[in-house]
Swiss-Prot record:
Function: Part of the small subunit (SSU) processome, first precursor of the small eukaryotic ribosomal subunit. During the assembly of the SSU processome in the nucleolus, many ribosome biogenesis factors, an RNA chaperone and ribosomal proteins associate with the nascent pre-rRNA and work in concert to generate RNA folding, modifications, rearrangements and cleavage as well as targeted degradation of pre-ribosomal RNA by the RNA exosome. Positively regulates dimethylation of two adjacent adenosines in the loop of a conserved hairpin near the 3'-end of 18S rRNA.
Domain KH: residue ranges: 197-249
Name the record gives this protein: RNA-binding protein pno-1
Alphabetized SMART domains for the sequence: KH (SM00322)
Disulfide pairings: none
Organism from which the protein derives: Caenorhabditis briggsae
PANTHER family the UniProt entry points to: RIBONUCLEASE Y, RNA-BINDING PROTEIN PNO1
Keyword RNA-binding assigned: yes
The protein's assembly and partners: Part of the small subunit (SSU) processome, composed of more than 70 proteins and the RNA chaperone small nucleolar RNA (snoRNA) U3.
Family as reported in the entry's similarity comment: Belongs to the PNO1 family.
Length: 276
């Protein structure tokens, strides 16, 4: 186990000499919505980059390329040959395709309280059909009968699944409006399988921190959202931010001091700001 811990430290180095406690001024009281935090990243990724034209050398000579291939009159003139050469367009899914998201018992009440906020963007913005099957205890989503594209259907499924896992509606809805967000789930045993009993509870306590401060700092610094559900960790965010948050959570599970993890995150966040 020592070798795995040292290998992890090499990948995610910890800084020495950090204070033992977090400063109160560094801990935000409330977090903005995940959509607002990642909107700037989405806009920057869509901006055009100005590419300067390279100067042409004075002794450069234009080279004219000639096509020496002889076209076959029998194939070019026939419309049937052109039809055979064109690839057929494949549909992404069948018409009226559906998705199912199971709902555990402890999420019945939150789902009922937030049902209006859930089905409104799915029905009005995406144009899908949704219902909660009480008998089978699952949320069912379906494409319209005249639509084959399943992109919106998959977005709506990820949105509902994120809410069922424990994320707030205002954070989970970012999966519908932004394309660069991902949802990752892993267990504490996947990081350190030797943890059992009270040691698992201590690892969960290190992730959350006193009054949830450690988790709040990680979320605010990495622009992600974290849900700790029993021994499972769910992280929602962009790919690079999700990687930073996952490394921070894994460091806490392996026993690193929260102040050191926070200091390392703060330095990485400052480096990212300098690059932008």
């Amino acid at each position: 186990m020592a070798t795995s811990s040292s290998a992890f430290d090499d990948e995610f180095p910890m800084e020495e000499g950090m204070p033992e406690l977090l400063d109160d001024e560094d801990v935000p009281s409330t977090l903005p919505s995940l959509l607002e935090q990642n909107m700037d990243t989405a806009l920057k990724s869509n901006e055009f980059k100005l590419v300067k034209r390279k100067r042409r050398a004075g002794n450069a000579v234009d080279v004219v390329m000639e096509d020496i291939s002889q076209p076959d009159d029998s194939t070019t003139d026939s419309p049937d040959a052109d039809a055979e050469q064109k690839p057929t367009k494949r549909s992404k899914g069948s018409k009226g395709e559906s998705r199912v998201v199971p709902v555990p018992k402890h999420r019945y009440t939150p789902l009922k309280d937030n049902w209006v906020n859930i089905f409104t963007p799915i029905v009005k913005n995406l144009g899908l059909q949704i219902r909660f099957n009480l008998k089978k205890r699952q949320v069912e989503l379906r494409n319209p009968a005249d639509r084959e594209d399943t992109t919106d259907l998959q977005k709506a499924t990820d949105f509902v699944r994120a809410f069922i896992l424990g994320f707030e509606v205002n954070d989970a809805i970012a999966l519908i409006r932004l394309d660069h967000l991902f949802l990752e789930t892993f267990e504490i045993a996947d990081v350190k399988h030797s943890l059992k009993g009270d040691h698992v509870s201590r690892a969960i306590g290190r992730i959350a921190g006193k009054d949830g401060r450690t988790k709040l700092v990680i979320e605010n610094t990495t622009k992600t959202r974290i849900v700790v559900a029993n021994t499972k960790i769910h992280i929602l965010g962009a790919y690079q931010n999700l990687k930073l948050a996952r490394n921070a959570v894994c460091s806490l599970i392996l026993g690193s001091n929260p102040s050191k993890v926070y200091g390392n995150l703060r330095n990485m966040a400052s480096r990212g700001a300098e690059r932008l």
